[in-house]
């Protein structure tokens, strides 16, 4: 049985990355960066458990990709690490950052082979530039660049973090207890992804796949007297609306499901449940804007959408162009990429009896192409 747990930290909000897409969700081929990193480590060593630390929103989606252990991050890297360590029972723990995405196998093996040398095994690089501290030159032979992953004795690392003092890495925490830290050779390949320009320094990351991802959405709402009718964010001049927990914009609801389906993010009921009173009477355009944000930050680009509205009443032809531009604006795409069709049910069924409306929606997504940026 392996005696090492792997912890990969990725709960940061990518502020310095300066992109709409979280760096954890940039795609390499057909998998997001965090999964590329996890699978790379998994292929290089036998671990008792792999723990991914991330935000609650991301964890919900990550679970669709792989069966790892997921832990909610904290306000700081140290808080995130403490959360991850709570259920670690192996003798050793290997901690790295998802942003450290091109760690070579030889570097991992050097770290693991040295496990009995000290309480913490740390990969380092020499400094080749001249260094000053304020106005005083430093002896660069005494300075090292510290990298991750770092291997620690689990019990020691847990004890070291039981303090209010903040540490920038595991070795600093272990060293603060007077425990021995052992250096091994690091690697220039293990460059950390901090800004978008760093992507050029990461040869192990492939360009995203050019595959198109398609999702389908369907929603149905009955009419209700005395409510305002809104379709695609456009008010329709009739004296009835839709019976619903929110404003009942059946077209936007179908579109949200299509977008979520293409991204593999579940459905509208999971993200915006009708049991949550905060969505009572909610403006559906707000829900769509939030869905678009989720889609973009998780590595997707919206291509085109196609919607079919089945309605015996009201007559929608006068509103189609306005609805098209409303959806294009909400999706932040060009109007020609939005197609809206309206048809009757030939007086058949509940739609034909003018009891409600059904909407079908199809949405196409592609992976965000960071290679072209």
Swiss-Prot record:
Its EC number is 2.7.7.60, 4.6.1.12. One of its GO terms (molecular function) is 2-C-methyl-D-erythritol 4-phosphate cytidylyltransferase activity. It catalyses: 2-C-methyl-D-erythritol 4-phosphate + CTP + H(+) = 4-CDP-2-C-methyl-D-erythritol + diphosphate; 4-CDP-2-C-methyl-D-erythritol 2-phosphate = 2-C-methyl-D-erythritol 2,4-cyclic diphosphate + CMP. A divalent metal cation binds at residues 219, 221, 253. Residues 1-212 are annotated as: 2-C-methyl-D-erythritol 4-phosphate cytidylyltransferase. Keywords: Isoprene biosynthesis, Lyase, Metal-binding, Multifunctional enzyme, Nucleotidyltransferase, Transferase. Its cofactor is a divalent metal cation. Pathway: Isoprenoid biosynthesis; isopentenyl diphosphate biosynthesis via DXP pathway; isopentenyl diphosphate from 1-deoxy-D-xylulose 5-phosphate: step 2/6; Isoprenoid biosynthesis; isopentenyl diphosphate biosynthesis via DXP pathway; isopentenyl diphosphate from 1-deoxy-D-xylulose 5-phosphate: step 4/6. SUPFAM superfamilies: IpsF-like, Nucleotide-diphospho-sugar transferases. In the N-terminal section; belongs to the IspD/TarI cytidylyltransferase family. IspD subfamily. In the C-terminal section; belongs to the IspF family. This is Bifunctional enzyme IspD/IspF. It comes from Sulfurovum sp. (strain NBC37-1).
């Amino acid at each position: 049985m392996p005696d090492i747990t792997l912890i990969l930290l990725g709960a940061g909000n990518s502020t310095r990355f300066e992109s709409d897409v979280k760096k954890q969700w940039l795609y390499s081929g057909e998998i997001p960066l965090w999964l590329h990193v996890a699978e790379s480590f998994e292929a290089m060593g036998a671990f008792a458990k792999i723990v991914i630390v991330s935000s609650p929103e991301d964890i919900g989606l990550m679970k669709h990709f792989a069966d790892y252990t997921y832990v909610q991050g904290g306000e700081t890297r140290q808080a995130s690490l403490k959360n991850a360590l709570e259920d670690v029972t192996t003798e050793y723990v290997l901690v790295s950052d998802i942003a450290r995405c091109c760690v070579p196998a030889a570097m991992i093996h050097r770290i693991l082979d040295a496990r009995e040398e000290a309480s913490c095994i740390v990969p380092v690089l020499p400094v080749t530039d001249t260094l000053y501290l304020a106005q005083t030159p430093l002896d660069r032979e005494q300075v090292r660049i510290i990298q991750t992953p770092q291997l620690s004795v689990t019990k020691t690392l847990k004890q070291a973090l039981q303090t209010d003092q903040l540490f920038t890495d595991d070795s600093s925490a272990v060293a603060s207890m007077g425990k021995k830290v052992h250096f091994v050779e690091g690697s220039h390949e293990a460059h950390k992804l901090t800004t978008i320009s760093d992507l050029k320094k990461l040869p192990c990351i492939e360009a995203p796949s050019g595959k198109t991802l398609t999702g389908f959405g369907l929603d149905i709402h009955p009419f209700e007297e005395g409510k305002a009718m809104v379709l695609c964010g456009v008010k329709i001049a009739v004296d009835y609306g839709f019976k619903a927990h929110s404003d009942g914009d059946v077209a936007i609801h179908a579109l949200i499901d299509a977008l979520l389906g293409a991204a593999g993010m579940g459905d509208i009921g999971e993200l915006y449940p009708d049991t949550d009173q905060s969505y009572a009477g909610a403006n559906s355009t707000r829900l769509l804007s939030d869905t678009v944000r989720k889609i973009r930050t998780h590595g997707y680009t919206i291509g085109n959408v196609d919607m079919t509205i089945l309605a015996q009443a009201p007559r929608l032809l006068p509103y189609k162009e306005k609805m098209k531009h409303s959806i294009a604006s909400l999706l932040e795409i060009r109007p020609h990429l939005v197609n809206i069709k309206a048809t009757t049910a030939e007086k058949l069924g509940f739609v034909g009896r003018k009891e409600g409306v059904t909407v079908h929606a199809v949405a196409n997504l592609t992976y965000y192409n960071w290679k072209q940026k």
